[in-house]
Amino acid sequence: MELPDVQSSLPEVRINLTRVGVKNVQKLVEVARPGKRPVIFISNFDVFVDLPGSLKGANLSRNFEVIDDVLQQAIDGDVNEIEELCSAVARKLLDRHEYAERTEVRMRSKFMVRRETPVSETSCHEVVNVHAKAIAQRNEGDPIIRKSIGAEVTGMTACPCAQNIMKDHALHVLENLGVAEDKIEAFFNEVPMATHNQRGRGFLCIEIDDDQHISLEKIIKILKDSMSARIYELLKRGDESYVVMEAHKNPRFVEDCVREMARKVIAQFHDLPGDSVVTIKQTNEESIHQHNAYAERKATIAELVSEMDKGTL
């Protein structure tokens, strides 16, 4: 006896659905690298297709089959980047869901990075939150695919405003103690003033066409270098002194971090097409306030270049 295909039957309410699929599909992703050890990601996938009003349901088992097929390609070395992996899944979903006009794949991963502390060169690890996305739109011939790659990194920021207040206070104290003006200036040049700090979380995502490539390592570096200082899981005394001094020599508002990321994106990825979309977010968890500070910018590469040329960034 042949079972009825319930998914292909007519629904009672015949409207199109924007997204139908599965969320939080957990997979271990192994991406091969030529001449190097493979990169391992602990990943969660969200996989969707659109559904016409003439169908009661989507065949969700096809989503799992496609993910497994593409993950095997990554192990075999046919897919070398996680955004390419999402793109490959989105493309295959269109093949397997012949009724779909649009497919979407999201991937959230934990990426373990080996680090060395700045002074003692002690080895430690850092977990970076990585995400990728691809959207495929059916078209005559090849589908139109847009993909994105991004990361979220934690760092340290030092408040410029409070630092100026403390510097002004120290100046009056030193003057009252009779310290010469040139000595005061020399002291300030060597020892940055105290200020309150924040743990900052920087987010950077770049959306590109399917034939473009973005280095995840470069995105992570931009994030780390756009705050006052990097932070580490393990610090010896010399390392701790270095990190604190580095942060206080480089005070930044939450707005400064976002603008610095934008500047570094343009410098690093200047060859990207102008319609590439950059999303930058920074959240600073305040130490002396009960609220957090936040700044954001979303723009195309062309828009950022135009503003920088005008001197607004």
From Swiss-Prot:
Top-level division of the source organism's lineage: Archaea
Main EC class the enzyme belongs to: hydrolase
Signal sequence segment: none
Entry-linked Gene3D superfamilies: Urate Oxidase (3.10.270.10)
Alphabetized Pfam families for the sequence: GCHY-1
EC nos: 3.5.4.39
Pathway this chain belongs to: Cofactor biosynthesis; 5,6,7,8-tetrahydromethanopterin biosynthesis
One annotated GO molecular function: iron ion binding
Cofactor(s) required, per the database record: Fe(2+)
BP term (GO), one: tetrahydromethanopterin biosynthetic process
Reaction it catalyzes: GTP + H2O = 7,8-dihydroneopterin 2',3'-cyclic phosphate + formate + diphosphate + H(+)
Keywords: Hydrolase, Iron, Metal-binding
Site features described as May be catalytically important, chain residue numbers: C159
Cofactor note: Binds 1 Fe(2+) ion per subunit.
Role of this protein: Converts GTP to 7,8-dihydro-D-neopterin 2',3'-cyclic phosphate, the first intermediate in the biosynthesis of coenzyme methanopterin.
Quaternary structure and partners: Homodimer.
Family, similarity comment: Belongs to the GTP cyclohydrolase IV family.
Identification of the protein by name: GTP cyclohydrolase MptA
Record organism: Methanoculleus marisnigri (strain ATCC 35101 / DSM 1498 / JR1)
Lineage: Archaea, Methanobacteriati, Methanobacteriota, Stenosarchaea group, Methanomicrobia
Gene responsible for this protein: mptA
